[in-house]
Amino acid sequence: MPEDAPALRQETLLRLGAQIRHSPARSGVNGARRLAAQTAAANGWYYMDWLANDDNPEYHRRVTGPAIVQSIAREGKSAVDAIVIGVGSGGTVTGVGETIKAWTNDVRIAAVEPYESQALGGGLTGPHGISDLGYGFVPENFNAYVVDNVVAVNTTDAQRAAQKVLRTLAILPGRQIVNTL
């Protein structure tokens, strides 16, 4: 993982028994991917690239997407205008989007990325403060054909929204949720 990965993530992995190898922070996620692939090849291990492995969106085609379809069907299609999904690996938005679009075109799919790193929207990419989104490139798992629009979220606005939810509802939103608020 990049040497600047969140400390809590590193601590959690270590507690689970992982051995962590760091790639330079400046090389970002792609540097970590290269290091993981090289390490796997050198040791005869299988490298499961979460950004290019169809098992990722397939899970969301089989589980998350159908659960959302059932929920919308229960409430009525007119009750939901859009589903907003933060894009990191592209697996969730692709799997859910494909499932929803196979069922109906009446529900829009919005993909969220950091304003400061707009690879999906074709803009400039760069550093930002939203963990697990906006890697600076379009992940292989991302299916643009199921996305109706891409929304860029400013890091500061995402953090403020998370703080507001925590203060008003006493809910600590996860990293992906912060971006869709």
Where are these regions (language model features)?
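Short glycine/serine/threonine-rich phosphate/pyrophosphate-binding segments
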Residues: 1, 6-10, 86-97, 176-181
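Acidic, glycine-rich active-site loops and adjacent beta-strand->loop/helix elements
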Residues: 3-7, 26-27, 87-91, 113-118, ...
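Active-site/ligand-binding-proximal alpha/beta "capping" segment
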Residues: 43-90, 96-99, 144, 156-174
